[in-house]
Amino acid sequence: MFLIQNTLVSLDVLEKDFCCDLDKCRGCCCIEGDAGAPLTDEEEEKIREILPVLLPDMTKEARAVVEAQGLSYLDPSGEKVTSIVNDKDCVFARTDHNGWCYCLIEKAYNAGKIDFKKPISCHLYPIRLNQVGDMIGVEYHRWDICHCARVLGKKLHLPIYQFLKEPLIRRFGQEWYDELCLVADEWKKQGK
């Protein structure tokens, strides 16, 4: 682990390669798993504000889940996560005619309809954040369904922290990211 400002960054974030390969996985991280995506109170409030833009594109099942239980629920560990359909699909996920999964929030953002890209936990994936005392742990979450992303990342020699530059800056700021890059460069120079 490396200490960068108020974070403890896992060595895997610097050493492991990763690059989403949507041609292979088709975005299955949005529709697999046993819980929704981690969500902050602020993000839930923002999604509540933009929900009228999203509702028309949500599936009938997703709208029913949101109506019945709301935008989020507490997972077994007590963490607030996005609501899911049929115990796996995020309520904001849709599948196109080619079987590709996409995020309705991100689609609306890219179309200029809203000013919120998506929850930071989704944007940062495969990094997960967790509280470690008064620090934030920044850790790599290894999931079997992302095997193709590890293969492509290795082929491209693209470490996780470089692949996730934009969301890391979004969450922690440019100064933090620059410091992370310095730590990574020093680590490489030492032949680690």
Model-derived features: positions:
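Short loop/turn segments that flank or connect secondary-structure elements
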Residues: 1-192
